[in-house]
Each structure stands twice: as structure tokens, then as C-alpha cells.
């Protein structure tokens, strides 16, 4: 008898988790949903029955003792407070926030890349990577295995859903506010008022913001999204000295993160070799031109536009473009795939 819990079940990623649990026929006899007091008491249809959402603030170790796996997507603050409680009650927690990713005693797992790390549990918690890192890892791991990855230069073009529901609502409202005046931006960037900037530094509608995430106050002038890309890539690939430089850009796309990756390797690797490797890689789909619209709603990371990097000698550099659904594989799906590994 397996019992699974979804914490943050009514949120943006939680909704996708519920859908995927049904689609994948996850082997659970009992499912419990948790959310904040604001959403507690709601009834959600799941597998033909209605399940009442429980108030996470009322949870106790005793009330949680039947749970085997808990999928968390309730934000870092809630995870820090409640994930240890679920773990103490006997559950293995798979957390989608950034709360535990840098903890040396918490494995950071991409199901296709380092699944065996699930056996190294100290705190009863497994961390899910950031959605941008997630898109890249199934692509980079098999290339690393073939040629030895030594350096990454990455630019990411991240959808507004990566900022949560506030990002989605902000873009939709700004597009509506500008309306038919949008073509006036051709000659004047101030031609129309997009309204409230929401969670961003400037209007996102009809714009590109080279500032995704929050500025880290450590003198590097990097955002937390850019540092996550470096730190998480090193941890997942087991390459603590991997050189990673990233610029994370927010773009007016609802779902789907796209990355341009300049990868340098220890050994030569040609475009033909890379295509052959990636064509056989798990969690990867080889296409001519990856786009966020094409990636939205599918499980795989799309990879294409593969070229030799002419700035790296001896055919040791590749340029690739990757697109991935930041809500699906970038968050919900990988969490569930980890849970599937746990209950096998």
C-alpha cells in the first residue's frame, strides 16, 4: 500500500503534478493533497473521486505517518518548514523549491542523469533542480560522458510562468492594456502604457528583460537564476570545477524555457557524433529548430541548431539550442519521475 502526498496541490505546478499522476497511472493506493489555509477545504477531482485539500499548517508528525512519498511544490519557505516534518514522519520528500538544492546532504536529481543518487538520503529529502538547469541536463550528460565537459557559456530565454502565476497574469494584462497600440512600438518604445510591471524590472509585454531572477548581494552582479545554473549543473553532473557562465533573460512567452549553450569539451566531438548521441538519449528529442511553443506540453528537452563552435580549437566545442517545458519536465514531471524511482 503506497500513499503519496502533493503539497502545494492547488498551485501552478501542483496542478500539473496532479495531471501527470493520473496520466502516468502512478502506483499509489492513496493520494492526499495539501495547500495553504486559503485553499484548504477545496475538493479536487482525482481518478474519479473527490479529494479534500488539507491545511498544511495543521499537519503533525502523527497525522502524516502513513505517507510514503511527499511531492512538494509550495515554495522555499514552506518547504523549509514542513519538509522536515514529513521526513520525520517517515516520508521521502521530493522538493521542487530552491530550499534544499545546495545542501550537501540532499541529493539533486534529474531522473535521466543521476537516478542512483536517490540511494544517498541523509535527511529524507531529494531536491528537484531549477527549470532552466533541468532542460539542459538530459542534453549535456550524454555529451559529457562522450567527450568530458569542461566549460559552459549559456544564455537562457525564460518564460513568464517561471515567475509563477504573477508572471503569467502580468504578461496577459500588459498585452491587453497595450491592445492595438502594439504596432506603435515599432517607432517609439514609450508609445503605450503597459501598466503595472508586476514581478519584473520593466514591462515584459513586447519586451525582453536581461534580468531573470533576483540580484544576489555578493558582488558578482549575477541573479540567483544565473547562479543556480552554475551550482546545480556542477552538483548534478558531479563536476565541482565545471566552469559555467550564464545570462538569464525573461521573454514574453507563457511557457517554455529556451537556452543557447556553448559547450567546451576535453576531447573532440563533431556535430555528427553529437546528433547520434542525442538521438539515442533518454529525455531528449532531436529537432531542427527548438522553440518554446514546440516544447510546451511535452516531456522531452528539444535540442537542435547543433554546430561546431569555431572559437574552440580541435573540434572540442559545440553550440546547441535547447527548449523545455518549464512547468512539465522543468518542475512537475521530474518530481514524479523521482517518486517513481522511489516506489519501484
Curated annotation (Swiss-Prot):
Keywords annotated in UniProt:
Amino-acid biosynthesis, Diaminopimelate biosynthesis, Lysine biosynthesis, Methionine biosynthesis, NADP, Oxidoreductase, Threonine biosynthesis
The residues the record assigns to binding phosphate are 101, 228
Question: Which cysteine-cysteine pairs are annotated as disulfide bonds in the entry?
Answer: none
Task: Cite the active-site annotation.
Answer: 131, 257
Per UniProt, NADP(+) binds at 10-13, 38-39, 161-162, 326
Its annotated pathway reads: Amino-acid biosynthesis; L-lysine biosynthesis via DAP pathway; (S)-tetrahydrodipicolinate from L-aspartate: step 2/4; Amino-acid biosynthesis; L-methionine biosynthesis via de novo pathway; L-homoserine from L-aspartate: step 2/3; Amino-acid biosynthesis; L-threonine biosynthesis; L-threonine from L-aspartate: step 2/5
Reactions accelerated catalytically = L-aspartate 4-semialdehyde + phosphate + NADP(+) = 4-phospho-L-aspartate + NADPH + H(+)
The entry marks the following residues as binding substrate, namely 158, 250
- Reported EC number(s) for this entry are 1.2.1.11
Per its UniProt entry, what is the enzyme's top EC class, as one word?
A: oxidoreductase
Tell me one GO biological process term.
lysine biosynthetic process via diaminopimelate
Concerning Pfam families, the annotation shows: Semialdhyde_dh, Semialdhyde_dhC
- What PROSITE patterns does the annotation carry? ASD (PS01103)
Q: Name one GO molecular function term.
A: NAD binding
Quaternary state and partners of this protein?
Homodimer.
Family from the record: Belongs to the aspartate-semialdehyde dehydrogenase family.
Role summary: Catalyzes the NADPH-dependent formation of L-aspartate-semialdehyde (L-ASA) by the reductive dephosphorylation of L-aspartyl-4-phosphate.
Name of this chain's protein: Aspartate-semialdehyde dehydrogenase
Provide the species name: Corynebacterium glutamicum (strain ATCC 13032 / DSM 20300 / JCM 1318 / BCRC 11384 / CCUG 27702 / LMG 3730 / NBRC 12168 / NCIMB 10025 / NRRL B-2784 / 534)
Query: Lineage from the top down?
Result: Bacteria, Bacillati, Actinomycetota, Actinomycetes, Mycobacteriales
Q: Supply the gene name.
A: asd
Amino acid at each position: 500500500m503506497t500513499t503519496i502526498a502533493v503539497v502545494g496541490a492547488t498551485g501552478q505546478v501542483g496542478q500539473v503534478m496532479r495531471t501527470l499522476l493520473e496520466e502516468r497511472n502512478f502506483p499509489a493506493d492513496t493520494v492526499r493533497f495539501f495547500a495553504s489555509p486559503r485553499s484548504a477545504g477545496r475538493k479536487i477531482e482525482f481518478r474519479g473521486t473527490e479529494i479534500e485539500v488539507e491545511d498544511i499548517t495543521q499537519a503533525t508528525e502523527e497525522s502524516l505517518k502513513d505517507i510514503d512519498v511527499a511531492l512538494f511544490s509550495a515554495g522555499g519557505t514552506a518547504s523549509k518548514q514542513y519538509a522536515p516534518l514529513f521526513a520525520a514522519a517517515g516520508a521521502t520528500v521530493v522538493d521542487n523549491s530552491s530550499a534544499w538544492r545546495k545542501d550537501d546532504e540532499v541529493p539533486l536529481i534529474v531522473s535521466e542523469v543521476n537516478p542512483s543518487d536517490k540511494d544517498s538520503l541523509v535527511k529524507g529529502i531529494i531536491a528537484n533542480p531549477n527549470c532552466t538547469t533541468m532542460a539542459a541536463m538530459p542534453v549535456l550528460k550524454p555529451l559529457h560522458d562522450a567527450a568530458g565537459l569542461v566549460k559552459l557559456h549559456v544564455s537562457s530565454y525564460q518564460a513568464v510562468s517561471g515567475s509563477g502565476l504573477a508572471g503569467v497574469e502580468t504578461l496577459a494584462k500588459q498585452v491587453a492594456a497595450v491592445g492595438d497600440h502594439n504596432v506603435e512600438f515599432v517607432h517609439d518604445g514609450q508609445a503605450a502604457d503597459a501598466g503595472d510591471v508586476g514581478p519584473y524590472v520593466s514591462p515584459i509585454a513586447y519586451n525582453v528583460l536581461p534580468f531573470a531572477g533576483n540580484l544576489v548581494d555578493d558582488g558578482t552582479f549575477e541573479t540567483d537564476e544565473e547562479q543556480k545554473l552554475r551550482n546545480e549543473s556542477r552538483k548534478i553532473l558531479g563536476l565541482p570545477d565545471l566552469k559555467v557562465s550564464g545570462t538569464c533573460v525573461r521573454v514574453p512567452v507563457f511557457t517554455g524555457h529556451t537556452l543557447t549553450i556553448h559547450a567546451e569539451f576535453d576531447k573532440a566531438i563533431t556535430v555528427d557524433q553529437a546528433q547520434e548521441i542525442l538521438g539515442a538519449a533518454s529525455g531528449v528529442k532531436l529537432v531542427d529548430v527548438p522553440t518554446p511553443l514546440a516544447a510546451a506540453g511535452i516531456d522531452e528537452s528539444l535540442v537542435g541548431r547543433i554546430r561546431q563552435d569555431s572559437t574552440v580549437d580541435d573540434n572540442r566545442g559545440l553550440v546547441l539550442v535547447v527548449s523545455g517545458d518549464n512547468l512539465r519536465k522543468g518542475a512537475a514531471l521530474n518530481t514524479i519521475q523521482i517518486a517513481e524511482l522511489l516506489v519501484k
